[in-house]
């Protein structure tokens, strides 16, 4: 929708830099807490890469009509198909390379990598492409009813949407803190 509304490149890059910065903080924090299973390609890392890819495709007009739906389906199906092919016919060296932290972000693996969060390019690029397709579909069919004055619930949801990265970055420390407090209280009794 941002592309359809004419979001400028400087505004896109500013938001993208925020996502990348938060992804780096997640990696550093998880490395500190979980040195053997730190997050090298989680939700924010995946979003940063996929935002670049999808925006690039959108501004070139390559995601029109059924294209994002078809490409999305291809990306969703590619991960399990390529992983099965790798497991049955791939070389052990290629399998080990794709399983490594340096390449597992592609999503062509035979087992889940040892990490606390993992959102690989395949299949998740497909889901983001479906989101781009859904946004375009909605944009083309919006009516005057869709631009009416928002009610209280809609304004609250819009506020959450505008600050979603902040909420995302706060939810893990809050949840971990609550779990640690619960554990400490449980151990005391």
Residue spans of the language-model regions?
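Alpha-helical transmembrane segments and their immediate juxtamembrane cytosolic regions
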Residues: 1-189
């Amino acid at each position: 929708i941002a592309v359809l509304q004419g979001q400028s490149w400087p505004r896109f890059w500013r938001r993208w830099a925020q996502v990348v910065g938060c992804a780096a903080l997640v990696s550093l924090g998880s490395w500190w807490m979980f040195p053997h299973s730190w997050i090298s390609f989680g939700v924010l890392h995946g979003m940063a890469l996929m935002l670049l890819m999808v925006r690039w495709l959108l501004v070139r007009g390559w995601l029109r009509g059924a294209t994002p739906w078809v490409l999305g389906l291809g990306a969703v199906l590619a991960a399990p198909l390529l992983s099965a092919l790798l497991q049955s016919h791939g070389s052990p060296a290629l399998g080990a390379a794709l399983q490594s932290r340096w390449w597992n972000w592609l999503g062509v693996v035979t087992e889940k990598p040892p990490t606390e969060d993992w959102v690989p390019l395949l299949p998740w690029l497909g889901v983001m492409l479906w989101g781009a397709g859904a946004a375009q579909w909605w944009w083309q069919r919006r009516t005057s009813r869709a631009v009416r004055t928002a009610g209280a619930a809609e304004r609250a949801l819009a506020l959450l949407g505008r600050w979603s990265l902040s909420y995302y970055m706060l939810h893990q420390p809050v949840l971990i803190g609550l779990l640690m407090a619960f554990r400490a209280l449980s151990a005391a009794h």
